[in-house]
Amino acid sequence: MGIVARQSIKGTIATYIGVAVGIVTTFFIQTKALQPEQIGLIDILLQCALLFGGLAQLGTNSSAMRYYPFFKDEDNRDHGFFGWTLLVPLVGFSFFLLAFFLFKGAIVEFFTKDSEVGAELFAKYVNFVVPLAFFSLYISVFETNSNLLLRIVLPKFVREVGLRVGTLAIYLLYFYKVLNFDGVIVGFCVLYGLATLVNIVYLFSLQRVSFKIEWKFITPQLKRDFLFYTLFMITAALAGNVIPMLSKFFVAAKTSFRLAGVFTIATNIAAVIEMPYRSLGAISRPHISEAMAKKDVQRADELCKSVTLHQFIAGSFVLFLVWINIDYLFDLLPKGDIYRLGKWAVLLLSLSRLVYSTFAVTTTVLSYSKYYYYSLIFTVLLAGMSIALNAWWVPRWDINGGALANLVSYFVYFILLLVFIKWKIGVMPLSRKLLPVAMIVLVLFAFNWLWTSALTPLIVKPFEKPIVGLTLDAALKSSLFFVLGLTSLYKLKVSQSVNDLIDRVWDVFRDK
């Protein structure tokens, strides 16, 4: 994949450094320092900010990816294209600010009417959604600008590492009573503000970016096309941005903020599944956009198949490692008995994240094709289905209902989307190479069942402290099955890129 692979690898390294920090923060510091209802509150505030910030973009991120090839001109600093990416979201945020204060009462009532534990906290801190939304908005916009210039590493580092390190610091200050809970909420606002500032400075350092808009470059036809596209993307974003958050909102509103905290931990565990796609997808989108702009369907099809295959390999292996160690993870967590309530939600959410990250490239293809307006139909369908299923299942099955609603909604959505883009565009991300990957993972699950039944009791028994034996057991089986899985991939030659990577790693160890 050339530059796609190189930038993706660097971005993935930054992502997994962030994952390491995030694991310590989320599963050990946060659960130790905060009560479940406080965890639920912070997550709901951040999710509301991400939702409103996403809507305030007015489709800027998608529009930027689609129209940048028309502006791309290094000699003329891209005709001030990046100025548009600042102006449009600012207009959107102004509308959001007005809507927020008009409907704040209804928002507070939704989260407090039926919720039990922790609802009063939301009413107290709801105004902090505004600064968090503003900073989240421009963190995303500046990261998209960097992606367009194929410079994803620093913005990725800021998002995946910087924000997590800052979050860790905030929780430690709260744990040691340097901050009270008010200080925690204010601290998040300061943290996101600093992240936005770093991204601004980085963009200026590239010296390619100009925020001075060249109004004369915008032809009437381009203006009409842009406004028409943006109109659809705004409506699509209204549905698309809501989906990942709906289950969290319903769990908090229809059960309690305490269970929302449990659901947050389950969601954070499952989020590891899609980490590779965050880099792979970010660096692939400009190339897919360029291929679609040139009507190079074959190139777009090759990119989609490659992204889908490599994300499925990475995601399914990570899902396997997470699930075979899930009980051990809950044994390690502070207040683990409380968060163990989310065990099956972890599995359902992990499967949902695997489905989403594997096939999310289909939404990219549709957005950059001449059929982009169909994205509105698909996302409204997804939103409607998700709302209905959450409203039906959360009151019945609590967090498991929310997780199941998430999985079923995405599964149906992507089946329909796969059929559509094959029919209308001629792109099919699915390939036969996915089958051997699925078979390898299923066989590994069978081996794990045998291991757990026969060997785990023997490994744990000699130790006075069971946690020591469980740690050894987790390390042994994870290492063995991971190596076995990679060996199987290598022998079956599922991916030449994976084989080349294994060869390079093997050569390093062999030379030593």
Language-model regions, residue ranges each:
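Signature of the first transmembrane helix
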Residues: 3-62, 92-101, 112, 132, ...
